[in-house]
């Protein structure tokens, strides 16, 4: 692995933090598109920390592991928690974890070069955004209410992503009109979107159009 990747940084920092011998071989099969808003490098680092924590006999939510995740970068700590969760700060302060639930999801990636995270945040700053509460969504997640959660999906970066890439807006319009889609939203800073579907069959149909 190149030494400047988030995976390398996560592994070496955790080994040092735990006093473990970093005698491990790590390979990464990249399946997450770049510039899609899916947290590719953060997800890689989070998965690395979870795997190494297990290997070295430490809980992935141990304060030392979380501390390393924060040092690696934004949102890495989020990927230490394998259940729906509310994180604050730079995606590194766990506010609440919710029960797991099953919900068929399809990802739709438009045929574009994607959107850089920095460009999305710059556009967000330019456009401005009113704060939106998340209590209704959290209440639905606590209750395992998929329909309620679908009704309160929100991403304040979505308008910026749509402004930078018209295909993002077109995908959202298309998903809105599809049968079997409970709700859809842009992932992170874009350019991918996800659809929360009624059934696995609906999700597969959306994913293979």
Predicted regions and their residues:
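ATP-binding N-lobe of GHMP and related small-molecule kinases
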Residues: 1-36, 54-66, 100-102, 110-113
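Generic non-transmembrane alpha-helical segments
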Residues: 9-17, 64, 68-71, 170-179, ...
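DPxDG-like acidic metal-binding loop motif
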Residues: 36-62, 78-82
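Glycine-rich beta-strand-to-loop/alpha-helix junction loops that act as flexible
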Residues: 40-41, 186-191
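Glycine/threonine-rich beta-strand-loop-alpha-helix active-site module
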Residues: 57-98
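Conserved, helical-rich catalytic subdomain that frames metal- and/or nucleotide-binding sites
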Residues: 81, 86-183, 198-201, 208
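Short hydrophobic/aromatic beta-strand micro-patches
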Residues: 194-196
